[in-house]
Amino acid sequence: ELQFFLDHKVPQVKFVDRTFNCRHDHAMEIWRYIKEHDNGITNFHFELAADVLKDDEIELISDMRPGLIQLEIGVQSTNIDTITEIHRKMDFKKVADIVTRINAGHNIHQHLDLIAGLPYEDLESFKQSFQDVYEVRPEQLQLGFLKVLKGSYMEKQKENYGLVYKDTPPYEVLY
């Protein structure tokens, strides 16, 4: 399937599973394949958890053609109370170290995501999250707003957090 995109010189292919690299062998297999079959045009976009990247993964991607891949890393927040409350596991210090290591190769575009409106996140802690992410110098810092999806944990907790959000897609938090 990847070869089809390469043969047809598709400009960009996105892997939108934010846990793409949680299966180490699978990620390595795909990255090796696209490196070996690089057509010089197609860019592959991966959403991943940076803090679980292993050294051999970093070494492999650091040796790729500039522009062959780009990484989207969903930080969401660096406020530990927020991260705990939304049931995420993330070591931001490790994320920052890995993003910095990858940046040193000057071949991989990285963008890190933050979300406004999360539990226990106020203006000051959001500013701190912004500063923390800004300091690691990703090529792009993407800001999004919390969306309260039907059936999600946040929808079940909406009264506890006093969430007011749009009742039509994309269900963004208003306040």
Put a short name on every predicted segment.
Residues 1-111, 116-118:
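Conserved SAM/AdoMet-binding glycine-rich loop
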Residues 24-25, 81-86, 116-124, 136-175:
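Flexible glycine/acidic-rich beta-alpha junction loops that bind and position SAM and/or redox cofactors
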